[in-house]
Amino acid sequence: MPELNFKAIEEKWQKRWLEAKIFEPNIKDKPKEKKFYITVAFPYLSGHLHVGHARTYTIPDVIARFKRMQGYNVLFPMAWHITGSPIVGIAERIKNRDPQTIWIYRDVYKVPEDILWTFEDPVNIVKYFMKAAKETFIRAGFSVDWSREFYTTSLFPPFSKFIEWQFWKLKEKGYIVKGTHRVRWDPVVGTPLGDHDLMDGEDVPILEYILIKFELKEGEETVYLPAATLRPETVYGVTNMWLNPEATYVKAKVKKGDKVETWIISKEAAYKLSFQDREIEVVEEFKGEKLIGKFVRNPVTGDEVIILPAEFVDPDNATGVVMSVPAHAPFDHVALEDLKKQTDILLKYDIDPRIVENITYISLIKLEGYGEFPAVEEVQKLGVKSQKDKDKLEQATKTIYRAEYHKGIFKIPPYEGKPVSEVKELIAKDLMEKGIGEIMYEFAEKNVISRFGNRAVIKIIHDQWFIDYGNPEWKEKAREALKRMKILPESRRAQFEAIIEWLDKKACARKVGLGTPLPWDPDWVIESLSDSTIYMAYYTISRHINKLREEGKLDPEKLTPEFFDYIFLEEFDEKKEKELEEKTGISAEIIHEMKEEFEYWYPLDWRCSAKDLIPNHLTFFIFNHVAIFPEKHWPKGIAVNGFGTLEGQKMSKSKGNVLNFIDAIEENGADVVRLYIMSLAEHDSDFDWRRKEVGRLRKQIERFYELISQFAEYEARENVELKDIDKWMLHRLNKAIKGTTDALEEFRTRTAVQWAFYTIMNDLRWYLRRTEGRDDEAKRYVLRTLADIWVRLMAPFTPHICEELWEKLGGEGFVSLAKWPDPVEEWWNETIEAEEEYVKSVMEDIKEIIEVAKIENARRAYIYTAEDWKWKVVEVVAEKRDFKAAMSELMKDQELRKRGKEIAKIVERLIKDRAFEVKRIDEEKVLREAKDFIEKELGIEIIINPSEDKGGKKKQAMPLKPAIFIE
């Protein structure tokens, strides 16, 4: 058979689908009980989609196709997300001729150079990648209703008016507030940064450091060294301070409110703190070595402690000033021990080594399992030799900090006897109230980079608009909605629950980027994670909006909140529809149809997305639905999928390690790509794309096409007399139908592919081996029937090939709309399956014996089946599943009692092996019927139950495990 032209077949059927509009559902006379509405997070158009995206979008398409074939009226729409600063950031970097950005877009995304330079205008980026993404989705065979397509931002005014309505509703309910809050901030562009505004570091948490002001006397002036700590309770155990002698520090006037103080902090800290409600005026700049050997006063205990040198102090972390608590901090203990051995360093800074030698550790916390100094003990336990043992030190630190926080009891007045977890909060509060403590926010890692290419800082913003996800009543509604929802996989539910708990105010608007202006404060633009939470409702009316727009009959400015209120929130009302006709210029009939569509499709049945959107989009999706819509319209389910890697490596466009979705289709064909990514892992697991495996799968699909094409020539005559092997094939086909159906109902795409493709392929191979030489009506009936069912089972995965084969089979219409197969009741036959498995098992046993025993030129196999009394033993054990109960029952039989000792051994072994699943078959009959086949396959003579006991094997025979002797 010539090589299959996947591309030609795909283009043929994509054209026919679009022309016939088979994926544009009509709701007229369609029962709501049989509707199925599924959506997936619309893609962000800052570049080409890669094969990781292919997984995210193929899963819901497979499910949509499956449900459509089950007879459901399916809506699977698509739109494009262009909100936010990323696209603007790309345009800016291209304008500035940033080499990395130009390389990505020219060499990785393969944008022609003449088009690339037009990307200085962000609108051109949007147009280019929107067209490319739609082409990719069509080429992938996605069964999308394109009549509902739209894109976000004010560039598409109807959707922008919908977002305005959403925000008015949130504001009316008190869920949008103006206030002060810490946000990630691009200091160059001057805008808050949401998750989607970051090039790197979206998962990096923000830490809250307590700055404790240690006093340094410089003549008459008091200067503060604010030591940054995550453990303020340990201030009582400070023995010294650490500064990096090589780092640059500044003396600065720090003004917060009306208070002005002089601080010594790292140069980097001065910059960061200037964004956190402080005015910073640098007075002097110097190296840390200037302060080494000086003493500062602990503001809590009054103790004078020395400043010691430590190159491990990172000036770019918090203030660059670190307090040392060696009794409870492994790093501090080891650093002190190292310094005691480095007298040359101490003498360099005119420090008397005896001062360091005589530092006394201060025990603060009683911790079960440890003595006075837990950090010292943990360091010794792990065998830490010096500061170079960083991994062990990190481990020791985590162990001690966690144990002390959760189980430690504080020993120092006035907090003695209280748990450390409580004391930590009390001391932080006390420090703040006394003016000797302040808060500084810092990223846990440094790699937080905006889409503009700038390193982010944390800024305290005033007069910023927030969505108040911390509202207790709103949280309760979100919890209630989550309880009612189906979450796939169920293991993700706990993550959603945790996120609902910790979500707080989130900045919802910024000053730059594409988007919808905040309706009551248009200087602000709604950000990308805030305009993408309820657009699934907009899909339900978007085809009408698009049609009106194309006909020039829509004035977006007339799409007022009153219009959206009626469509989405109110009861049907003819009078209201007439009023809205007057106000909007849209006919009352179309307004009625819009409302009908929304009421028909909502609630959303399934929302699909990758797991990285759980902490933001998917949880915001729940919150915003419960805020705006009545309970009957709350979403019903969320399905979360895993990520993709490429040849074992994380995909990264900056490193060029990325495979564009469209390139994968060009190289392999859409059906190959679809089946491959569905077969690699269940939807919730990560997958790894490997080119060699894709090539192998392509050959298997070509074999599938070849087989069905061959079977299409057969006639499937009814009422033919079937042999047992024919019945076996139909029974196995039933199993594949059920297995595929059950798996797809739970989004278990890998299991579904195993059943629909690999299991049937393997069963068919066996059937063709077992029926070799036959060309009768029964075999033709089985193969023609199998072809009809197999093509339909595979249609959700490989729709183009299956349409082509469906046409060959003479199927009516499109296979995409054909009836999903149901198991045929009369085909079920567990006995025949057990008999066929028995034949396979015996053949495998014979081959194994020959191989293990290294028998050359084997000529005969003597097979001894179990005596009838052994069947009775096995059946009783399967029923009782207990040694005493089974023996008690068996010993009631006089004949069996004579074999008591032998039976006891058998029962003991069966229970140990948990051999409880048995189905009695006539082993000798099955073997005699399969004798010719076994002899042909194995090339040896088969002798069944001869009178002669060859090799004394006969007594070893057990039910379904015959004794075998080879000669």
From Swiss-Prot:
Q: What class of enzyme is it?
A: ligase
Renumbered to this chain, motif 'HIGH' region spans 43-53
Pfam families given in the database record: Anticodon_1, tRNA-synt_1
- Indicate where this protein resides in the cell: Cytoplasm
CC terms in the record's Gene Ontology section? cytoplasm
Q: Where is this motif: 'KMSKS' region?
A: 650-654
- Which keywords does this Swiss-Prot/TrEMBL entry list? Aminoacyl-tRNA synthetase, ATP-binding, Cytoplasm, Ligase, Nucleotide-binding, Protein biosynthesis
GO BP of this protein: leucyl-tRNA aminoacylation
- Enzyme Commission numbers on file: 6.1.1.4
Source domain of life is Archaea
Note whether Calcium occurs among the keywords.
no
Catalytic reaction list: tRNA(Leu) + L-leucine + ATP = L-leucyl-tRNA(Leu) + AMP + diphosphate
Positions binding ATP in this chain are: K653
Q: What GO MF terms are annotated?
A: aminoacyl-tRNA deacylase activity; ATP binding; leucine-tRNA ligase activity
Tell me which family the UniProt entry assigns to this protein: Belongs to the class-I aminoacyl-tRNA synthetase family.
Q: Which NCBIfam families match?
A: leuS_arch, PRK12300.1
Which HAMAP family does UniProt cross-reference here?
Leu_tRNA_synth_A
Its recorded name reads Leucine--tRNA ligase
Originating organism: Pyrococcus furiosus (strain ATCC 43587 / DSM 3638 / JCM 8422 / Vc1)
Q: What is the lineage of its organism?
A: Archaea, Methanobacteriati, Methanobacteriota, Thermococci, Thermococcales
Tell me the name of the encoding gene. leuS
